[in-house]
Amino acid sequence: MYHAKTLLFYVHDWKKFPELEALYHQIYEKIPKERVQKKTVAGMGKSLQAFLSNLQVSHLHDVPIRLHLANKDFASGFYKKVHIAREPFRLVLKSLVEQGLMEFQPGFKTFTKDELFFSPETGEEDKHYGRLSRIWPTDRLRTMLDKLDW
């Protein structure tokens, strides 16, 4: 799925998404928590809320969400500022993909000066295509979101 237009992953105010609460609990119960530290399990809730709100926005606007997955973004960047830890975030991401609720397209490594990438849409050189990972809801999650009371 290639879209020239994407939205950046954002930590929305969870209170603005009350309709997602039941879906949140349903999905949270299915996330594997065995052999995971208590601190990591505690952070999974906030990460899941962030993913669900972004997937809902992606569903409503029909565009993928791009997100940073570099360690530096968790250590001193955006995620650190909004108190989202790397390990719970990645475990929730993996679980959503395994549950068949989210599509995930990993980003490409940063390009060097000599590397080129060709856009699948235009066929022209594009050094900026795909640097960030992208997520969007699967048809299964879209069906679940459509059934919610808005």
Mark where each language-model region is.
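Electropositive, intrinsically flexible nucleic-acid-contacting patches
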Residues: 1-44, 50-150
